[in-house]
C-alpha cells in the first residue's frame, strides 16, 4: 500500500510542471544532437579533432536536455505526489475542518486534503489561466476530484490571493 500512496488515481492529471520549458528542452536537445551529428559528418574529413569535439559537445548538450526533461517529468508525476503526501500527512486532521487551498491549480493539495475530511470541506481558490499550457482550469480540478472520488467535498472558486472572497475565520486551515 505504501507505493500506492504516492500515486494519483488512474486518470487523475495534476499536470506537468513548466510544460513549455520541458518542450523547449526536448527540442533543444534534439536540435543540438542533430546539429552535432551534421557538424561531425561535414567536418570529419577536413578536421577530425574538431569534428569529434563538435560531436561530443552536441552529445553532452543533448544528454543534459534529456536529463532535464526526465527529472522534470519524474518530479511532476511522482516527486510532487510524495511531497504532497508528506505535507498533508504531517497535519493532525480531525476530519471535520474547512480548509482553503490558495492557488490550488489542478487540485493536488486540495484533493489530498479533501480525502482526509470525511465530514469537512475543501475549497480551492485560483486565478484560472486557461490560455496557458498547464491546463489550469476549474473544470480540470473538479474532474480530478471526481476521479479521486471526493467531488462532493471539493469546491473551486475564482479569486485572487490578494483579495480573497471569504470572510475572516471562514476556514480552519489554509494551504
Where do the model's predicted regions map?
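A short acidic, Gly/Pro-enriched loop at the edge of an enzyme's catalytic core
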Residues: 94-97, 162-174
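Conserved acidic residues
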Residues: 126-128, 160
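Conserved class I S-adenosyl-L-methionine
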Residues: 95-105, 123
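Conserved SAM-binding loop of SAM-dependent methyltransferases across substrates and taxa
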Residues: 106-118
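S-adenosyl-L-methionine
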Residues: 135-160
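Class I SAM-dependent methyltransferase Rossmann-like catalytic core
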Residues: 14-29, 65-87
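N-terminal auxiliary segments of SAM/dcSAM-dependent transferases
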Residues: 2-62
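Short, flexible/disordered intra-domain loops and linkers
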Residues: 128-136
Amino acid at each position: 500500500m505504501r507505493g500506492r500512496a504516492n500515486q494519483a488515481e488512474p486518470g487523475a492529471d495534476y499536470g506537468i510542471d513548466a510544460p513549455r520549458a520541458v518542450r523547449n528542452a526536448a527540442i533543444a536537445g534534439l536540435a543540438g544532437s542533430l546539429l552535432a551529428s551534421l557538424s561531425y559528418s561535414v567536418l570529419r574529413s577536413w578536421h577530425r579533432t574538431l569534428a569529434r569535439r563538435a560531436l561530443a559537445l552536441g552529445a553532452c548538450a543533448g544528454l543534459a536536455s534529456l536529463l532535464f526533461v526526465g527529472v522534470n517529468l519524474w518530479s511532476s508525476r511522482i516527486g510532487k505526489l510524495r511531497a504532497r503526501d508528506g505535507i498533508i500527512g504531517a497535519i493532525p486532521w480531525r476530519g471535520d475542518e474547512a480548509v482553503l487551498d490558495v492557488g490550488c491549480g489542478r487540485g493536488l493539495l486540495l484533493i489530498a486534503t479533501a480525502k482526509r475530511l470525511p465530514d469537512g470541506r475543501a475549497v480551492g481558490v485560483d486565478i484560472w489561466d486557461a490560455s496557458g499550457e498547464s491546463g489550469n482550469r476549474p473544470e480540470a480540478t473538479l474532474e480530478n476530484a471526481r476521479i479521486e472520488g471526493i467531488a462532493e467535498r471539493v469546491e473551486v472558486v475564482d479569486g485572487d490571493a490578494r483579495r480573497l472572497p471569504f470572510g475572516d475565520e471562514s476556514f480552519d486551515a489554509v494551504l
